[in-house]
A protein has these predicted regions:
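Acidic, PIN/NYN-like endoribonuclease modules and their adjacent C-terminal/linker elements
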Residues: 2, 85, 109, 113-141
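Acidic catalytic patch
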Residues: 37-40, 69-97
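Short active-site oxyanion
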Residues: 30-33, 77, 113-119
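Short beta-strand scaffold positions
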Residues: 35, 80, 103, 120-121
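Short, well-structured N-terminal submotif of metal-dependent ribonuclease cores
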Residues: 1-41, 50-66, 132, 138
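Conserved glycosyltransferase catalytic-site signature
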Residues: 7, 83, 104-106, 123
Length: 141
């Protein structure tokens, strides 16, 4: 069975931070790890944010982006984001009670839902929404 990894798991996989050990365990246990083209854009945004905020150096960012590109090419299945995913994400945002679901997370959820695969996330709001919307989820506290 495949699992869809959101960006909250991928960032600590490639940057040394609090969730790094858990991210390594999650990716190691999953023989079929999926992401979307949305995830690729979000990863790029997160790395740029870390660099602009002075959280990491240019060298660290370059290394992380290179390792991520290698992982995408050799290990991850990258799926397209469809118009129906955006429509479904809008519905998920509207139907998820407080604290709600942010649009980027709703899009990840819609993609996992479309494929009927497990969501792997470290985002607790997204993990809660998975349960509400019938998507199996693995998360870390």
């Amino acid at each position: 069975m495949a699992a869809y990894f959101d960006t909250s798991v991928l960032i600590p996989l490639f940057f040394n931070e609090a969730g790094t050990a858990a991210a390594r365990l999650e990716i190691a246990r999953e023989p079929s790890a999926w992401v979307s083209h949305w995830t690729l854009a979000e990863f790029s945004s997160a790395t740029a944010f870390k660099l602009r905020g002075g959280q990491v150096t240019e060298e660290t960012t370059t290394t992380a982006k290179s390792l991520f590109a290698q992982c995408v090419a050799s290990r991850l299945t990258v799926v397209d984001v469809l118009r129906e995913d955006f429509v479904n994400a809008a519905g998920l945002c509207a139907s998820t009670p407080a604290p709600g679901l942010r649009t980027p997370d709703a899009l990840h959820l819609a993609i996992a839902q479309r494929f009927g695969i497990v969501m792997v996330t470290f985002d607790q709001a997204l993990a809660s929404a998975c349960g509400l919307h019938g998507v199996a989820c693995r998360s870390s506290d």
